[in-house]
Design a protein with these regions (language model features):
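N-terminal secretory signal peptides that target proteins for export/translocation
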Residues: 1-10
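Bacterial N-terminal signal peptides
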Residues: 15-25
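Secreted glycan hydrolases and related glycan-binding modules that recognize and/or cleave
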Residues: 6-7, 24, 28-247
């Protein structure tokens, strides 16, 4: 039987619902934290981003060295005019890839770049490839990475960035193929300069990723750590993407 409320009772119920919603939002906001670089120890440093005080405490720096561009003929666009000597942190040399159609010249130049940084006295951890591989093509990406791994000296590790929807929509065979060839995946919860809404739901499914992984955070962005992260033996921490301060 339907029940009809009078205007006064309906107003009271409306106020109660509004209070409950406000309380819920307050709890959610209390749980979320703003990512502050000084609270972390691993960072991406892209070209054009000014060094920050937090880098002094860095244990690992993911440094953009170049971009592999070109739809018809791949070529490298260098992002660093010189090879600095970074004292202290481990350094990952990062290449942003628009294409994975690398010829031998491209791969040899990338590997030579790693050796040049190492010869300059830097503690090179390895090579990270930043490529937006689609969830339906991870096996093809893994095949490309296998070729890179075959040429990469054993003293260097191989890492990649990962998209959030890998955990939800990628086929298990593709994920397993990646797990065999790479040492780590850094899963980014942001796109461009914005945190992806609903990232918590994707991260809850990361248990399917049977490879060492980190979470890529955005400096100044929101972050709520799911309980499942700490329970995963494959979770290895965070990498913060640094931004220039807003003017």
């Amino acid at each position: 039987m339907a029940t009809q409320f009078g205007p006064r009772r309906s107003a009271i119920i409306g106020k109660l619902l509004a209070c409950c919603l406000a309380a819920f939002c307050a709890v959610a906001n209390a749980r979320a934290e703003i990512v502050k670089a000084e609270n972390y120890h691993a960072f991406w440093l892209w070209a054009g981003v000014e060094p920050q005080p937090a880098l002094q405490q860095a244990q690992e720096i993911y440094l953009l060295a170049g971009e592999v561009a070109g739809e018809t003929q791949a070529h490298i666009i260098s992002q660093r005019s010189a090879v600095p000597h970074l004292i202290g942190p481990k350094v990952w040399i990062v290449y942003r890839a628009q294409t994975i159609e690398w010829n031998d010249t491209i791969l040899n130049d990338v590997l030579a770049h790693l050796d040049a940084w190492s010869s300059a006295g830097n503690n090179i951890a390895g090579l990270q490839i930043d490529f937006d591989a689609g969830t339906k093509h991870l096996e093809n990406y893994a095949a490309f990475l296998s070729k890179v791994r075959a040429q990469l000296p054993s003293r260097y590790r191989l890492g990649v960035t990962g998209l959030l929807d890998w955990s939800a929509h990628a086929d298990p065979e593709g994920l397993q193929a990646l797990a065999v060839v790479v040492d780590e995946v850094v899963v980014q919860i942001y796109q461009g300069r914005h945190v992806i809404p609903g990232y918590e739901d994707y991260l809850a499914k990361l248990v399917a990723l049977k490879v060492n992984f980190r979470i890529g955070l955005l400096q100044g962005g929101d972050w709520v750590a799911p309980q499942s992260l700490e329970n995963s033996p494959f979770f290895k921490g965070y990498v913060v993407f640094l931004l220039n301060p807003k003017s």
